[in-house]
Amino acid sequence: MGGRGGSSHRNASGVMGRMPNWPDFLRFASQNDASLWHEQNSFNWDQWDHLLSDAERDGIRSYTGIWYSAMNTMLREGKPSAANVQKFIDGATSGLAKWQTAHDMVTFRGANLHWTANLLGGTETQMSDAAFLQSRIGMIVTDKGFMSTGTHQDSAWRADVKYTIFARKGVQGMYVDPISRNKGEYEFLFNRDTEFKVHMIRTNSSGQIIELVLEAKKTKR
């Protein structure tokens, strides 16, 4: 597939594609700086209390607690779960649709090979297949689930694959730390069905993906 830098093969450092050079996208020097900005620009207590319904607040809060795995597994793989999971999904979906990114900004994520393969439309084996990974450069992929991200590199989970996400202003999602059942994760949560453009992939010496650079473009709902 195309995309800037997408026609080149894996170089000596294991890089396919290119890291976007977009200086206007917000990055923060520290987690404290990121938290202060997002509390002022990506969350609003009045909006939370009065614009969202009880079901929407419950859905988002449930995701930040113990239900995130069941909700995303059901959405991404179609696996049935507890009866109340669909209620949480519906509430979180409609609630997050009422929030948008306030500025072009960068967020971060760590994910395992399983969910990275799911996002890229492949198998875990293909996460070490150079031809398959190269074919993803420039492609638009959709996360059928909710995507948890950190607002600073220090708050991103450590996992098999490091994600850097350039989020365009107006993408559906919210800074959930003020209302989270796991405060201190400093999480920005993207709504389900967000579209991402693949800009860069980095692999290790064995050819396995270890880094993914995405651009969050819009939400398909």
Locations of the language-model features?
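Mono-ADP-ribosyltransferase
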Residues: 6-221
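Hydrophobic, gly/ala-rich membrane-insertion helices/peptides used by toxins and envelope proteins
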Residues: 1-3
